[in-house]
Amino acid sequence: QDMQEMEAQGKRFGVEENPLREAGNAVDYSFPVERKEFLFVTSPFGMRQDTKDGTKRMHTGMDIRCNNGDAVLATEQGGKVVAVGNKSLTVEYPRADGCKIQCTYKNLGEVFVRTDDTVQAGNRLGKSGKSGEHLHFSVRQIHADGTQRDVDPAAYLAEIAQKGNIKQQVLHNGNDLFAKYKSPENAKENLSPDAWMKKLLSSEDSGVGLSGCS
């Protein structure tokens, strides 16, 4: 969802306008995939060109590189599993302002939870599968009036990172996807192509193909 459009309608999403809790720590929040240094995003939120027919389509989530069998994790405390499919699941988290945040995980190999289960941050929800060797992670904000918005997962994860003091970066082609959601003094410089390749080759995902995913 375009942040400017949301602000024009008086609906905001972010660490200042949509607080998770008064105080948080790493126990209260988690990224959807455990990584020691950074999440490797192969396809971010936004318009992208279809590799098959060349048409441009909106990609409403982000694709996170995974090894087959990597655990996928709940991101917050007190989530409720509201949907489970063969290779997907959705967890819903309430907000103090009456809105709800839904996090959806797709391309799973196994699902460990059932509908109506309550989950806490860091709980294992399932395992990534063989479909493109990536986790498709999307975020939807449901306002108290019932209107719904697809939110850039980078904005949501930036919020999670700040509230939970999570230090891992979220990178796409060497670019810090959190940069536009940080204050200038906290923004990190993007990596040069050589530095990005060096970082990839030394990362946990170095044994996985580096091409983008559909």
Locations of regions flagged by a protein language model:
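Solvent-exposed, flexible loop/coil residues
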Residues: 49, 66-68, 112, 155, ...
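Conserved, short, structured surface segments that act as functional micro-motifs
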Residues: 63, 90-92, 117-182, 190-191
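Amphipathic alpha-helical interaction segments
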Residues: 53, 113, 164-165, 204
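Zn2+-dependent peptidoglycan hydrolase active-site motif and core
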Residues: 57-60, 68, 74-115, 132-141
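Generic alpha-helical secondary structure signal
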Residues: 18, 99, 151-154, 195
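Surface-exposed, glycine-biased beta-strand/turn segments
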Residues: 2-92, 120-121, 176-202, 207-212
